[in-house]
C-alpha cells in the first residue's frame, strides 16, 4: 500500500501546472477590454420562510486584480457563484447551499459571435458533477463598468450575460503588432513534449512497480533509477539514429524527384 502511494505521488508530481489566464496572450481576448474589468451581481429574493441570496463574480483575466471579490470566493477564480439561505426565525447566520468555482484548470475557449464575445468553460468540478459555463459579453460603450444582466444555473449548465466595456473591441491604435498570436497556454509542441515525458515517467514507474511488487520501497526506487538512467542514456543515440534516417532519406527523395519522363 505504501509503495502504491509512492507511485501515485510520483505520477502527480509530473502533471503539468496551469497558470491563470493571461488575456493579453489570447488571440481573441486581447482584442477586447476584458482585461480591465470584472463583473459581479448579488440578488436577494424572498423564499418564505427563508431569504435566498445569489451572488456571481466573473473575472477571467489575471491582469485585472480581484480586489472586489465576494467572501467565500478565491482570487484565482475566473467564475464564482454562491447561493446562500437566511432563516431569520432561527436567528442564525446565512448558510451556503450552493457554491461553484471555475478556474483555468477547466477547459476554456473564447470565440467571437456577430455581436458578442463568448467564453465557454467545460469540465468544472462541482462535487461529483461536471458543469459547463457560458459567458456572453455584449458591448455597452456608455457604461464604465461591466454589469451581469442575467445569470441562470440550470442542472449542469451556467449561462451568464454581461453588458459593458469588456464586450467592446479595442481601437486599432490600442492593439500592438507584437501581441502573441497563440491562444492562452503553452504551444502544441511544448504540450507534446510534456506529455511525452509524463507518459515515459508513468511507464517507468509502473514497470518498476510490477517488477518489484514483492520487494521493498528501496527495491522499487533502485529499479526505477536504473531504468531511468538506462532510458535517458540511450535517448541521444536513438534521436541521432532517427534524425540520420530522416535526413538520409532526403537526398534519395530528391534524386528520384529529379528524373522525369521524356
UniProtKB/Swiss-Prot annotation:
It is a single-pass type I membrane protein; Single-pass membrane protein. Residues 21-185 are lumenal. Residues 207-262 are cytoplasmic. Keywords: Autophagy, Cytoplasmic vesicle, Disulfide bond, Golgi apparatus, Membrane, Mitochondrion, Protein transport, Signal, Transmembrane, Transmembrane helix, Transport. Residues 1-20 form the signal peptide. One of its GO terms (cellular component) is trans-Golgi network. Disulfide bonds join 23-61, 73-80, 139-168. Residues 21-170 form the MRH domain. The chain crosses the membrane at residues 186-206. It is found in: Cytoplasmic vesicle membrane; Golgi apparatus membrane; Mitochondrion membrane. Regulates the cytoplasm to vacuole transport (Cvt) vesicle formation. This is Autophagy-related protein 27. It comes from Vanderwaltozyma polyspora (strain ATCC 22028 / DSM 70294 / BCRC 21397 / CBS 2163 / NBRC 10782 / NRRL Y-8283 / UCD 57-17). The lineage of its organism: Eukaryota, Fungi, Dikarya, Ascomycota, Saccharomycotina.
Amino acid at each position: 500500500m505504501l509503495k502504491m502511494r509512492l507511485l501515485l505521488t510520483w505520477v502527480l508530481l509530473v502533471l503539468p501546472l496551469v497558470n491563470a489566464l493571461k488575456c493579453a496572450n489570447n488571440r481573441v481576448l486581447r482584442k477586447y477590454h476584458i482585461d480591465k474589468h470584472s463583473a459581479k451581481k448579488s440578488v436577494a429574493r424572498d423564499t418564505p420562510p427563508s431569504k435566498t441570496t445569489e451572488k456571481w463574480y466573473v473575472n477571467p483575466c489575471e491582469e485585472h486584480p480581484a480586489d472586489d471579490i465576494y467572501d467565500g470566493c478565491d482570487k484565482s477564480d475566473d467564475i464564482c457563484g454562491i447561493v446562500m439561505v437566511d432563516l431569520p426565525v432561527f436567528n442564525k447566520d446565512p448558510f451556503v447551499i450552493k457554491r461553484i468555482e471555475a478556474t483555468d484548470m477547466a477547459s476554456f475557449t473564447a470565440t467571437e459571435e456577430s455581436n458578442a464575445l463568448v467564453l465557454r468553460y467545460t469540465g468544472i468540478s462541482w462535487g461529483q458533477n461536471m458543469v459547463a459555463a457560458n459567458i456572453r459579453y455584449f458591448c455597452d460603450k456608455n457604461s464604465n463598468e461591466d454589469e451581469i444582466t442575467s445569470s441562470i444555473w440550470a442542472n449542469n449548465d451556467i449561462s451568464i450575460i454581461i453588458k459593458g466595456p469588456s464586450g467592446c473591441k479595442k481601437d486599432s491604435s490600442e492593439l500592438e503588432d507584437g501581441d502573441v498570436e497563440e491562444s492562452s497556454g503553452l504551444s502544441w509542441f511544448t504540450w507534446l513534449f510534456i506529455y511525452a515525458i509524463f507518459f515515459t515517467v508513468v511507464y517507468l514507474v509502473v514497470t518498476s512497480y510490477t517488477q518489484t511488487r514483492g520487494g521493498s520501497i528501496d527495491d522499487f526506487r533502485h529499479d526505477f533509477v536504473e531504468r531511468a538512467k538506462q532510458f535517458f542514456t540511450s535517448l541521444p543515440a536513438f534521436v541521432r539514429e532517427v534524425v540520420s534516417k530522416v535526413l538520409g532519406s532526403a537526398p534519395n527523395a530528391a534524386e528520384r524527384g529529379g528524373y522525369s519522363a521524356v
